[in-house]
Amino acid sequence: MGLPAQLPVTLLCLLAGTAHFIQGRRGDIILPEVIKTLNILTERKTPCTKLMIADALAVPKNTTEREAVCRAATALRQFYLHHKVSWCFKEHGELGDLRLLRGLDRNLCSMAKLSNCPGKEARQTTLEDFLDRLKTAMQEKYSKRQS
């Protein structure tokens, strides 16, 4: 008893359609997830949020939204991979926040869909200010998407 010759082709088409649907839905989920994570991180006022991070949100006007998001992800990654930052989060028992920053980085990279972006920003700001401004930008993006 064999399978009809058209069955594998049909299954492949269904699988491809499902993957496209899931990928599209993932994009709809990422932005609210980013905002939720930023809400959690900005509510907590801890010593580690006073640490300095590259001000990747101060971008030239001709920067695309994807580039800006990619720069923010790069700045976050460079920030949380630094040994002094990891030490601060461990010292103050904030490993959950460190995990949230890593997840935020992953989600921002997914939103940007860029593999390489500049990451050396001259200006510095506190993590607290960076996260507040990023949250405002993401909320504005979400509002535009809803209207």
UniProtKB/Swiss-Prot annotation:
InterPro entries registered for this protein in UniProt: 4_helix_cytokine-like_core (IPR009079), IL-4 (IPR002354), IL-4/IL-13 (IPR001325), IL-4/IL-13_CS (IPR018096)
The UniProt keywords, alphabetically, are: B-cell activation, Cytokine, Disulfide bond, Glycoprotein, Growth factor, Secreted, Signal
Q: Name one GO biological process term.
A: immune response
Q: Which Pfam families match?
A: IL4
Its signal peptide is 1-24
**Which cell locations does it reside in?**
Secreted
Instruction: State the GO CC annotations.
Output: extracellular space
Q: Which GO terms describe its molecular function?
A: cytokine activity; growth factor activity; interleukin-4 receptor binding
Q: Which residues are glycosylated?
A: 62
Where this protein primarily resides, as one coarse class?
secreted
- Using the chain's own numbering, where are the disulfide bonds? 48-88
| Function of the protein | Participates in at least several B-cell activation processes as well as of other cell types. It is a costimulator of DNA-synthesis. It induces the expression of class II MHC molecules on resting B-cells. It enhances both secretion and cell surface expression of IgE and IgG1. It also regulates the expression of the low affinity Fc receptor for IgE (CD23) on both lymphocytes and monocytes. Positively regulates IL31RA expression in macrophages. Stimulates autophagy in dendritic cells by interfering with mTORC1 signaling and through the induction of RUFY4.
In the record, the note on similarity to other proteins reads: Belongs to the IL-4/IL-13 family.
Protein's name in the database: Interleukin-4
